[in-house]
């Protein structure tokens, strides 16, 4: 009788363990509204939106749909390159983007505008930016190829 009780208990535990929920994934691609299927980085902003940088702009996902932001020909308030490799958010809610051509941009989600960050604060000049670092205090550092560090 003890063996039967032990066997029933053991099988109950084994079946309960096997009944655990499997991992579930949802696949998002250009068919669901993503601008391009090559995703370089993902960022969750302070509002809970997910941002995806792709080879064709950046995409905001609010949990239901995507909105795409990309370069516009001839616009001064735009990206220099649609291929965005990395994104960072500062405490003010601005997104800092690093494009494939090593240019840094700041995106304001409130106005939905881009601003190219000039080298060392000189309008019209550019630097090859390798890394963007956002400190917890809000200070943003751009580490460049030949122009040192820009704050």
What residue ranges belong to the model's regions?
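Carboxylate-rich, polar loop motifs that coordinate divalent cations or form catalytic acidic clusters
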Residues: 1-151
């Amino acid at each position: 009788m003890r063996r039967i009780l032990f066997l029933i208990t053991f099988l109950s535990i084994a079946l309960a363990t096997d009944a655990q929920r499997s991992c579930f994934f949802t696949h998002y691609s250009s068919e669901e509204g993503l601008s391009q299927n090559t995703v370089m980085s993902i960022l969750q902003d302070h509002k809970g939106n997910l941002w995806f940088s792709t080879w064709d702009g950046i995409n905001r996902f609010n949990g239901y749909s995507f909105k795409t932001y990309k370069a516009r020909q001839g616009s001064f308030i735009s990206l220099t390159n649609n291929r965005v490799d990395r994104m960072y958010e500062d405490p003010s809610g601005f997104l800092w983007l690093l494009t494939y051509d090593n240019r840094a941009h700041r995106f304001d989600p409130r106005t939905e505008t881009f601003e190219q960050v000039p080298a060392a604060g000189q309008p019209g000049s550019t630097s090859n930016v390798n890394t963007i670092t956002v400190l917890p205090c809000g200070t943003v550092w751009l580490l460049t190829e030949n122009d040192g560090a820009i704050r």
